[in-house]
A protein has these predicted regions:
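Rossmann-like NAD(P) dinucleotide-binding subdomain of oxidoreductase/dehydrogenase enzymes
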Residues: 79, 123-267
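Glycine-rich phosphate/pyrophosphate-binding beta-alpha loops
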Residues: 42, 153, 278
Length: 344
């Protein structure tokens, strides 16, 4: 049976890629291949940048209140398509239903923030800052921004943290969707178009490191926003800074818990489990180090074991599942190796 080949989204249209390189997309709960995403060619990435640049003058001229109205429409459409978006996140990322729904809801909340763009864009002024001088600060859009998206939050990060505020403030955007979880991004692209976002204001591609470097080096891209691992974040920040671009790189965290002897044991363990096991541990909020006061260490471990054994493991689309699969096989094998190391 032929496998669905995803398109890329540029200038308001979904287009077939001319690439020879494709990424297999899997349902983590079953392992089945559910489609293929293109590794867009350099020409296709340049096409997306050009579309964003061409759309910028007209979009920045749209009054802020009109851009805010479009954000309200996007928010409305997210709610209308909540079930479809949640299923997409669950089936391509592996989050259980409640986690996938939370991912989409966070995208909605980021969009709600963007509806307040008239307030966000307000400047400041100070008359007579010194004799004969007044100071005035304006906030203005800059141009084309690029968002580089991780695999673990296909909805919240690109369409909650990145795109809404960026374009609501009058900028345009090229989103590099995660190559293993791009389907949700394409659903959001449809929503943005239906909401009335003009062609070229938002563009979505999937590509490799080489094409990302094209984005980082391109003079028409004024800023970069990235979420992902620290090694990659450092390289992106260095390359973007060398090209004179604004850049924010949110990298991986190392979270710790310190449990004292007087802690409420059941509630504390429940919090530790939620942090460590939520999203199968594939998030920057995941707890990776827990230090317990010696006086309660044995009781803590017993309670942790008890609560962990009660977690229902199951497929992501089953609304009763509380722990879903690792997103892709490479990380699954790394987790098994770490477990073996711990047992040894």
């Amino acid at each position: 049976m032929a496998v669905e080949k995803l398109q890329y989204f540029v200038n308001g249209q979904f287009k077939d890629s001319k690439t020879d390189t494709w990424y297999d997309l899997h349902n983590p709960s079953t392992g089945e291949i559910t489609g293929q995403a293109p590794c867009c060619t350099e020409e296709e990435v340049l096409e997306a940048i050009a579309a964003a640049k061409a759309a910028y003058p007209g979009w920045r001229a749209v009054p802020a209140i009109k851009r805010a109205q479009i954000m309200y429409k996007i928010r409305e459409l997210i709610m209308e398509h909540m079930e479809e978006l949640t299923m997409s996140v669950a089936c391509e990322n592996g989050k259980v239903w409640g986690e996938a729904e939370g991912d989409v809801l966070k995208a909605k909340e980021g969009t709600e923030l963007a509806t307040q763009v008239p307030s966000l864009m307000m400047g400041e002024s100070l008359m007579d800052a010194s004799r004969g001088y007044d100071t005035v600060k304006y906030r203005e859009p800059l141009g084309v921004f690029a968002g580089i998206v991780p695999v673990n939050f296909p909805a919240m990060i690109p369409f909650g943290w990145m795109a809404p505020t960026c374009i609501a403030c009058g900028n345009t955007m090229v989103l590099k969707a995660a190559s293993l979880t791009p389907k949700t991004a394409m659903l959001f692209a449809k929503i943005y178009k239906e909401a009335g976002v003009p062609d070229g204001v938002i563009n979505v591609v999937t590509c490799s490191r080489n094409e990302i470097n094209t984005i980082l080096d391109h003079p028409d891209v004024k800023g970069i926003t990235f979420v992902g691992s620290t090694p990659v974040g450092l390289k992106i920040y260095q390359r973007a800074a060398a090209a004179g671009k604004r850049c924010q790189a949110l990298c991986q965290a190392k979270n710790h818990a310190l449990v004292m002897a007087d802690a409420a044991l059941e509630r504390t363990v429940a919090g530790v489990i939620n942090s460590a096991y939520g999203c199968a541990g594939q998030r920057c909020m995941a707890l990776s180090c827990c230090v317990v006061e010696e006086a309660i260490a044995d009781k803590f471990v017993e309670e942790l074991k008890k609560q962990a054994q009660q977690i229902k493991v199951g497929p992501s689309w089953d609304k009763s599942s509380k722990l879903g699969p690792i997103t892709y096989e490479k990380h699954y094998k790394e987790v098994l190796a770490d477990i073996d190391k711990g047992v040894a």
